[in-house]
Amino acid sequence: DLRMSRGLGDVYKRQIPIHIYADQVNCDKRYIIPLRIAEVSDYEPTPTDTVLMVNLKMVNEYSGTYIISGTNVRYENDEPIVSETSSLNTPRTMIAVDQYTVRLFHKVESEELTNADKAAMKLIVNPTDNTVTIEPWKDLPILKGGGTFDVEKHTFTIWYHYMENGKEYRTEATIVKNKS
């Protein structure tokens, strides 16, 4: 039931479930649905203000704000070079791409849309067994990777190999959803 009532001058905010075909939506674009007030009880609608603009925000079970912590290690001939290890601990926003996919920015890259092509990846969760497949968003040179998603803790555990300046690196990280 989507009926509502409010007093004169009261601000009303309500979430209305709208289901869309996410595979046909670009997560980086803004979509607005105009809704017109057709009728009201007790009052006359103001003729100039009868349209509501609804801004869509794509979310899924995995999207939201997280803290990523882990390590980056340089690899050579499939062996880690322990002396070339750096730590990673930064907040990240996972953007819903579709029902089972989120976009994650690599390392501590700025989460600006202009960086997405070269510095973002997709985490694709298999809902059957909660394994995670890692793929580049566009141009990030990921060689291989994988992981798991813990449904109860809302935590990703991932690893992936990537190339940077002609050298191979491995990231191992735990990504924990921010509860606040």
Where does each model-flagged region fall?
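Intrinsically disordered, low-complexity regulatory regions in eukaryotic proteins
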Residues: 1-3, 17-32, 36-180
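Single conserved hydrophobic/aromatic residue that forms the stacking wall/gate
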Residues: 2-4, 8, 12
